[in-house]
Amino acid sequence: MTDKQSVVIIGGGPAGLTAAWELIKDGGADKYDVTVLEGTREFGGISRTVKHNGNRMDIGGHRFFSKDERIMDWWKTVLPLQGAPSYDDKKLGRDHDMEPGGPDPETEDKVMLKRHRVSRIFWNRHFFDYPISLSPNTLKAMGFKLTMVAGFSYLKSMFHKLPEDNLENFYINRFGRKLYSMFFEGYTEKLWGRHPSQISADWGAQRVKGLSIMGVLKNAFQKLLPKKRSNAEVETSLIEEFWYPKYGPGQLWETVESNCEAAGVKVLTDARVVEVRQTDGAVSSVVYEDSEGNRTELSGDQFISSMPVKDLVNAIDAAGADPEAVDSKPAPADMTEVANGLPYRDFVTVGLLVKHLKLKNTTSIPTLGNPPIVPDCWIYVQDPGYKVGRLQIFNNWSPYLVKDVDDTVWIGLEYFCEEGDSFWNMSEEDVTKFAISELTRMRVINGPDEVIDSHRERVRKAYPAYFDTYEHMDELIEYLDGFGNLYCVGRNGQHRYNNMDHSMARHGGRRQHQDRQDVQEERVVRQHRKVLPRRKVNKPC
């Protein structure tokens, strides 16, 4: 029997934990010695769930849906689908296809709920479907004149295509200039802090993909057909049902971490990697720092990194070269320059627990609450008059996220900013007052007296951005690929705005078959810039 291969995984988010489990499951502990280094005390990265005074807050909102059925099956093996109605299912008389033999969410905690997606856009004090559609409600809210202008604008875009060398042109080609100016221009600038004309079209190629007015119309037509469509046939932004853990996405990743430890993975928290040491063209060890500033070196055969590319490059031989190794040296100056220029958008979410909503449920969708609350999971605030980018109503994600789900409403306000700017540096008291004032101006609540409790969370490097030195990513990728035993995975590890399922599929632990959709996506993105390839951890797998 050969010696075990030692694998060091940097990061306990979706990509890192997926890699750890895929390596260690089914007797993998006999082949691999796996260590996960997580820089915080929580698991799941941006997919974690924050607990506050009996209520739970989902950081960013995470629907469990994938076009890859293997990912869906993977989630289901961690948290089985509900086999009985949840609290709100029973109270509202909702029907779902229950999983035969599945757990009862009223009596068991390890369970995945089936949820109905409702998301809308708030613009000019009106609600529109999300993604934007040509529904009667949309046409009524826009009015006849604006609808005609938007319609002719879209027709023009069908026959006069712009070069897709930036995100602005990408959107105009799919929605027309009028709808772009209404719903995409200001919101994109709010999200990224840059005008869409300054952002690479790569972001649209990856995140928007097949979404367009024609895509929306096609989806509406297909919904009228009796044939049930598979996940792969539905544009991700248009899905109507998704899965969601009883206690939020963090519950799933906490369960995966627990399973990993039980199977033999060594997991270290408060272990922030500060140096990556190389010897003779390969990574030989990493140095991590604990919460008290103590540093420890950990050697390995293979290294899987989900830490931000900027931090990874700066960590390479950060303390100086090993004098006994000829080619042990820090990253070249030009690579460091590219890495340091990679932009990120940081994120602040403010949770507000309120007594009532001023906003009324005018839909036909039944909801909890007294009076019944609006049915939205998300409300996208496209209106440029507000800084908040998106609202989450946690009651509608899972009734088990809210301590008193019948008599209180737990809302998350999502703000995009940059670490160190004036909004990021606001005190929790001031940012809470600001959030309350925005909800009041939007007429979501009556005023400050409605607020019972609040909580602020700040997230660094939440969104890898597609401008500045991003255009030189191919050079940085080539440099990192030169380390034959280093594999960059996940959203920040690849500097790619992945969904959670994409981060899992590109986990670096074992080669996964690329389905047709992924191949098409890769081709579209590579028209603009080479992306990090999927690679197998050849030696340990």
Mark where each language-model region is.
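Conserved flavin/dinucleotide-binding core of flavoenzymes
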Residues: 48-49, 131-132, 372-377, 386-541
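Short, well-ordered alpha-helices that flank and scaffold nucleotide-derived cofactor binding pockets
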Residues: 21, 25, 258, 314, ...
